[in-house]
């Protein structure tokens, strides 16, 4: 059979990421080597290209969860084995693939589905926008002013001829007719000192029963951004 040895490099330490990927490696007949935040000083103690070359010699695949998206790009360019993007400050592609599968499981299709993201225009939103530039989507990002997603990524997604992409600050109209409501934490890693201030700014963007009255369905990533709404 195919030998599968995976190297996990998690600079942003998260239990769910480690468990899900290590379980996946195991079920595919391989095993994982975990390198935590203190094991590699990527871009500091160790050059990214050197890390990529060394790990490529010992492993069949590299899964990295990093702070800096530039490090992910350099890692993939320097490695001689496949590199899986487990998360960066710019995007989170594996999460979105899992979300699409969840939507499909509950709705039997991803066609003609309106997805509304409510909250901070962060790496999750960038991933949805990247997806909208590849496959047809009806996607709305509902966020406070000043918390919009990456402008270049928005432009790229809007320039497609097959996706409907909207960025809005109007809560009432933004969620109207939504089939899927998606939310995330208001203060991501590295922003915890802003948590109290963000809680005030995002208070009107909390997913709750009042908001859900204008939608067709509910799908939530539960956090402080969600209150009393039942999840699918």
Stretches found by the model and what they are:
Residues 106-109:
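Glycine-rich helix-loop-beta junction characteristic of Rossmann-like nucleotide cofactor-binding loops
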Residues 5, 28, 78-80, 135, ...:
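Short, structured coil segments at secondary-structure junctions
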Residues 7, 12-104:
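Phosphate/diphosphate ligand-binding glycine-rich loop within oxidoreductases
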Residues 4, 56, 76, 174-176, ...:
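A short, aliphatic-rich alpha-helical micro-motif
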Residues 1-6, 11, 221-232:
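Single conserved hydrophobic/aromatic residue that forms the stacking wall/gate
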Residues 158-223:
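Rossmann-like adenosine-cofactor binding region
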Residues 15-23, 111-161, 166-173, 177, ...:
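Glycine-rich phosphate/diphosphate-binding loop of Rossmann-like nucleotide-binding domains
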Residues 72, 125, 190-191:
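Glycine/Thr-rich phosphate-binding loops of Rossmann-like dinucleotide-binding domains
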């Amino acid at each position: 059979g195919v030998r599968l040895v995976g190297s996990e490099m998690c600079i942003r330490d998260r239990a769910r990421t480690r468990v899900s990927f290590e379980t996946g490696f195991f079920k595919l007949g391989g095993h994982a080597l975990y390198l935590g935040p203190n094991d590699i000083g990527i871009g500091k103690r160790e050059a990214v290209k050197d890390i990529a070359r060394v790990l490529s010699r010992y492993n069949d695949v590299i899964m990295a969860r990093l702070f800096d998206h530039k490090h992910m790009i350099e890692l993939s360019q320097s490695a001689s084995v496949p590199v899986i993007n487990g998360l960066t400050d710019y995007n989170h592609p594996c999460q979105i693939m899992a979300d699409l599968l969840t939507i499909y499981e509950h709705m039997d299709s991803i066609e003609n589905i309106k997805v509304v993201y409510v909250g901070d225009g962060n790496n999750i939103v960038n991933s949805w926008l990247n997806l909208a530039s590849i496959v047809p989507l009806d996607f709305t990002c509902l966020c406070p002013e000043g918390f919009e997603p990456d402008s270049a990524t928005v432009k790229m997604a809007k320039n497609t001829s097959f996706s409907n992409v909207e960025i809005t600050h109007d809560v009432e109209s933004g969620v109207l007719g939504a089939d899927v409501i998606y939310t995330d934490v208001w203060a991501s890693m590295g922003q915890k000192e802003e948590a109290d201030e963000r809680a005030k700014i995002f208070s009107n963007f909390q997913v709750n029963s009042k908001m859900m009255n204008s939608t067709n369905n509910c799908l939530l990533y539960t956090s402080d951004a969600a209150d009393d709404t039942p999840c699918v």
